[in-house]
Amino acid sequence: MRPYFTKMDDIGKPLRPAQLERMQANVAQAESIMKEIDAEVERIKNFGIPAEKVHERGEMTVWDRIAYIVDPGSFCPLHTIFDPENEESGSTGVVDGLARIAGKWCVLIGFNNKWIAGAWIAGQAENNLRVTDLAKIMNLPLVWLVNCSGVKLPEQEKVYANRRGQGTCFFRHAELEQMGIPVLAGIYGTNPAGGGYQGISPTILLAHKGANIAVGGGGIVSGMSPKGYFDEESAEELIAATRHFKAVPPGSVKIHYDSTGFFTAVFEKETEVLDALKGYMADMPAYNPRFFRVAPPAEPKYAPMEIASIVPVNPKAGYDFDNVLARLVDNSEHMEFRPGYGPEVYTGLVKVDGFLMGVIGNRHGLLPNYPEYTNEYIGVGGKLYRQGLIKMNEFVTQCGRDRVPIVWFQDTSGI
């Protein structure tokens, strides 16, 4: 397979000086939009308790933990500004993405302990399910950094369990484990109620010495009372016993390591929990990426920064998709699938970092004498016609057969 894809056909062409000059305003507008996105990412990162106060408590922020555990330069954040329920923080209370830990790829997610101690907040369930779906689809270990104070009670109706609610996340953990996909968790801080469920459902639980997980409330605590119910007198007795150290606080490390066995191991330092997660990830079976490379990695022949001079910010304006692709793929080479058939759609194979990848993209512009089944109008790029749909179906089927990943550059107004 390697020689077959070592050298492919060239794609793209240099930009003319006139086009670069004409698109200067577009470049400035695109850069302005990117700065707005970067500013929002930074705002979310700084939202909540200042990192300094978290550090004063002897704790790391979720950002600190991620920076410590991932291989340098490997973290690819996802869903950072995803906020489907317009939560006041502008996020879903978790930080997630793809990452390499101890040389092995995984899906990584952690509760943002700078905001309401990592509470379940509106929109978080959908984010969590997207993350677990990703682990399922890509067959990658799921690594949790758990520091969750449970549901944000004033908005608890927004996190009720349903098919896309928080309860489904725990079902997904069981589903992943049944599929042989490990779910690893580092446990920090106090994790009551839903935070406790989050803590007990992974495969391996590694806890910091100050960690606590408990699922409870008056109805649960009453089961510990000889009366069979929980009242003010029982509460006072429990408080007095706790003050005099006559009872081990439920959910503590002493309970879940010594008695229930939920915790696989307990560590003195926060970084030791992360080191232990690294150790488990190092033991994960995985192919070396070079096994799948069809050619040595190579830079595009044309500068990726020129894309802003090709793709207009105005969504109604057209552009040359082939020129965009040429600035993203190795050596600006491709192997087009069925060129000339279904011209409104590009389908082909390319290399990215030496790996083979399928590409589907919508081409723009007028298409004379097309579609072939009518003379009443001419085809317009960005729409989908019969030939293009047939070509996409064939291409996706063959990529699926050969397990070649596909990226779709979707820019279509429909059929």
Model segments located where?
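Intrinsically disordered, low-complexity segments enriched in small/flexible residues
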Residues: 1-106, 110-117, 243-244, 252-262, ...
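Conserved catalytic cores of soluble enzyme domains
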Residues: 2, 7-20, 24-27, 146-289, ...
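Generic hydrophobic alpha-helical membrane-segment signal
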Residues: 46-49, 135, 168-170, 191, ...
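Charged, alpha-helix-enriched surfaces in structured cytosolic catalytic cores
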Residues: 123-127, 164, 194, 200, ...
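Cleft-lining beta-strand/loop regions that shape enzyme active-site pockets
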Residues: 97-177, 184-186, 348-351, 355-415
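Alpha-helical hydrophobic/aromatic positions enriched in membrane-embedded helices and signal peptides
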Residues: 50-53, 139, 195, 403
